Every structure is written in structure tokens, then in C-alpha cells.
């Protein structure tokens, strides 16, 4: 079973609804709860569909794959997405939180975590026609 958890802190200077909007820009299929201190969401691998498409369009699958594999632990992995960029409908995948306002933490669990990583961010370092 696949499980996706997302959490984004809400700082005192931020509007919780805007933080929720940032999360939904990247994960439109996610069920979220907007609270004063954080936006939290849960879903399954289907909630990653939009992210998968964006990674392909922006040609950052290999970067994302490297981060996902670096943080691989048993049947889970995690990464961050820049919250400010997400509000502007952009995806910047991060190894660690770098923004003073905090970034969106994404945690993924799966019985087949490598299969999920291969789907979300396939290894595109070798073109398919060369690999054969």
C-alpha cells in the first residue's frame, strides 16, 4: 500500500489558506487540513500524479530521483518542495528545507518504494534507445 504525507509549516506572517493553495498547486488530488500552524495532507500514490508530470515537463526527474534515493529508508523516502515556488505553480525539489518560511515536506511510504521512485522519477540518464 502506498501512502503520501505532506506537511507545510504556516508562519505568523503567512496566510494559512495561501499555504494550502501552494500544497494543492503541486498535489491537487491530496486531502488537506489547513490549520493555523501547518497544512497537512495525506493521500496515496495517485496524489503524486501531478508532481510526476511536472518533474517530466521541467526535466528535473534525475535530480528528484537522486534526492529520493538519497533519503531512502526501508520502505520510505522523503524530500522537500519549496513552498514559495509552489505558490507560483513551480516545483523546486529540495534535499533539505532552505526557506526561512519553511518548505513543504513530502514523505512517501510504499511496499514497492523503488517501483514508485521509478514511476515518479525514472532514470533518464541513459536514453532508452541507447540502453537496448
UniProtKB/Swiss-Prot annotation:
Highest taxon of the lineage: Archaea
The record's family statement is:
Belongs to the UPF0201 family.
Organism of origin: Methanothermobacter thermautotrophicus (strain ATCC 29096 / DSM 1053 / JCM 10044 / NBRC 100330 / Delta H)
Q: What Pfam family is a match, any one?
A: RNA_binding
Q: Which residues form a coiled coil?
A: none
Name under which the protein is recorded: UPF0201 protein MTH_433
